[in-house]
């Protein structure tokens, strides 16, 4: 049973990246899945929401060396996967679900000679990220990306039967010299949970209802960029005042732990005495003198108006963009 239609071939995606970017913005895609599930280490649901609405620019495809070389090495990863497994693969392009017009999949490869439906996701990463793949692990955002592809390609969101053994492969070149691959088995319950979360996110887009903020500092940066503070003052309701009270309690606990931590540092430094190193069974401690760094006395520089202006004219002095600062104080009664 046919479950998808082809939106763009792989060759068309290379020739027309602007249309590709537009499609990625229009549909819920595989790279969105991990973000929607809250496991993307670089992007929050709120960031994705505002990207989809065009409030903030989405990262350009190929706008970094990592992305560029990831695409260059995609063929290498696919070829090595075939060499090690004997499974032939082919490029396909962007596929849209026939059963859900809001979901699409920009898949790297389709597997051709398996006894069950399968695809291949090709990844590259640095040696510093090797631990993310150790002992059979798969980074969670990549796991959900592959589940999304299965949801689109197999049409299970509407209850279509799926062939036994169906799944998705993911292969990764680590540090340029280590190759691994994993098979992600088809998991009906996990896919249904993902589809439900994606549908709820899409409804938020339609109704312009932002997802809740997370504990990520990225959300604070995003909100500061979106909201310039030009509206009239607001009244704090009971819920917000209770939130501030909880924050005060947390800050008090943090202060207490900071004091305990500082006491521990002081005791350790006192133990070192005139030594700059101490070694034990579990830990190694160093307390060495660092070279001082040069600093600019801005107050003195501004007094030398001629030199100060010359540095600004030469663009050796630059002013950063202003930012909003959150300050909480007790209200004055009466």
Predicted regions located by residue number:
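Accessory terminal regions of nucleic-acid processing enzymes
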Residues: 1-334
């Amino acid at each position: 049973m046919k479950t998808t239609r082809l939106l763009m071939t792989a060759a068309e995606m290379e020739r027309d990246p602007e249309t590709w970017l537009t499609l990625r913005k229009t549909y819920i895609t595989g790279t969105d899945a991990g973000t929607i599930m809250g496991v993307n280490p670089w992007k929050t649901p709120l960031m994705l929401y505002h990207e989809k609405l065009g409030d903030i620019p989405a990262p350009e495809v190929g706008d970094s060396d990592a992305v560029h070389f990831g695409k260059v090495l995609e063929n290498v990863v696919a070829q090595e996967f075939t060499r090690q497994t004997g499974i032939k693969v082919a490029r396909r392009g962007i596929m849209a679900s026939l059963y859900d017009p809001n979901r699409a999949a920009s898949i790297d490869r389709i597997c051709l000679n398996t006894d069950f439906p399968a695809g291949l996701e090709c990844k590259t990463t640095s040696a510093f990220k090797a631990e993310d793949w150790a002992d059979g692990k798969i980074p969670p955002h990549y796991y959900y990306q592959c589940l999304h592809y299965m949801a689109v390609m197999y049409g299970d969101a509407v209850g279509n039967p799926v062939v036994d053994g169906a799944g998705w492969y993911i292969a990764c070149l680590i540090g340029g010299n280590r190759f691994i691959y994993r098979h992600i088995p088809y998991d009906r319950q996990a896919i249904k949970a993902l589809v439900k979360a994606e549908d709820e996110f899409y409804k938020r887009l339609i109704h312009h209802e932002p997802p809740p903020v997370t504990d990520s500092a990225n959300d604070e940066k995003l909100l500061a960029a979106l909201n310039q503070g030009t509206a009239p003052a607001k009244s704090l309701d009971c819920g917000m005042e209770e939130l501030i009270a909880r924050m005060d309690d947390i800050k008090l606990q943090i202060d207490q732990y900071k004091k305990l931590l500082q006491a521990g540092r002081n005791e350790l430094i006192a133990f070192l005495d005139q030594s700059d190193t101490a070694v034990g069974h579990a830990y190694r401690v160093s307390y060495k003198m660092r070279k001082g760094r040069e600093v600019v006395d801005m107050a003195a520089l501004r007094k030398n108006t001629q030199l100060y202006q010359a540095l600004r004219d030469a663009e050796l002095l630059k002013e950063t963009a202003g930012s909003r600062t959150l300050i909480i104080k007790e209200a004055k009664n009466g």
